[in-house]
Amino acid sequence: MSFSDLMTGLMVIFMFVAISYILEVQKAEQQRQKVVTDFQDSKSAIYKDLRSAFDEEKKEWEMEIGKDLSIRFTNPQVIFALGKSDVTPTFQKILNDFLPRYFNILLKEEYRTRIKEIRIEGHTDTLAIYSKSSDPYIGNILLSQERSAKVLEYFRQMEYYKNLSEKQKEQLQYWITANGLSYGRTLDDNKQESFLSHEPINANYSRRVEFRIITTSEELIENIVNDMQK
C-alpha cells in the first residue's frame, strides 16, 4: 500500500468519525431543544388554564393573573383587617371558590413534573407592627408569615382538601410553602414592585396575598448545562 493510499484511507476514516460526531451533536441539541419547548409549552398551558378558569372573577375579586404564573389579591380590606392575620369572611368566600379550581388545575398529571413549588406569599406595607418586634421589618415579617400560614391552614380545613386522595395531599404538602415577605416587595400605584420602579409605595396595593407557581426551570437549565459539559 502506497503512502498516498494510506493517507486517503485515514482521511476517509476521519471524515466518517467527524460526520458521526456532528450527527450526535445535532441529535443532542434537538433533544435539548425539545425539552425546552415542551417546558415552555407547559408553562404557557398552565397560564392559559388559569386565565380560562378565573378571567370572569378577576374584577370582582380584585385579582391579577401574571404570565409568571402568579395570582395576586390586592384588596387589603377584603383579605385581612389592618394589622391582623385572621382571614376575613369575605376572603373566605373567595377562597372557597378559588382554591378548589386552582388546585384542580395544578394537580393535572401533565403538570406534575413541571411544578417545583407553590408559594403562598403574605406581603405588607411599611406600617410598623411594634407589638410583634421592635424592628418594623421583622414585625411585618411575622405578620405576613402569619397571614400566609392562615391561608394555608384555611385551605387544609376545607372539605375539598379533606376529600383529596392521600397521594394528592402528599403532593401538595411537598409543593406548598407559606412565606412572609414583610414590606420587601411593596407595590407602587401601577402595581409594580416599587424597589424596581423607584416609584412611591402604594400602601393599599402592597398589603396583599399572592399565590405563585415556581416551575422546575432551574433544574431544566442545570441539566442542559451539565449535558453540554460532558
Predicted region positions:
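Short, solvent-exposed beta-strand/turn patches at coil↔beta or beta↔helix junctions
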Residues: K67-F98, L127-N140
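Surface-exposed acidic, glycine-flexible loop patches that form ligand/cofactor-binding
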Residues: E62, L107-R112, K167-Q168, E199-N202
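Extracytoplasmic
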Residues: E60, G66-D68, F73-N75, T113-I115, ...
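Periplasmic OmpA-like peptidoglycan-binding domain that tethers envelope proteins to the cell wall
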Residues: P89, H123-E218
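Periplasmic peptidoglycan-binding/anchoring modules of Gram-negative envelope and division proteins
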Residues: K84-R119, L152-E166, F211, E219, ...
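Short, cationic low-complexity segments
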Residues: N226-K230
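Short amphipathic alpha-helical segments
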Residues: D38, S42, I46, T90-I94, ...
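Short terminal targeting/anchoring segments
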Residues: M1-E56, W61
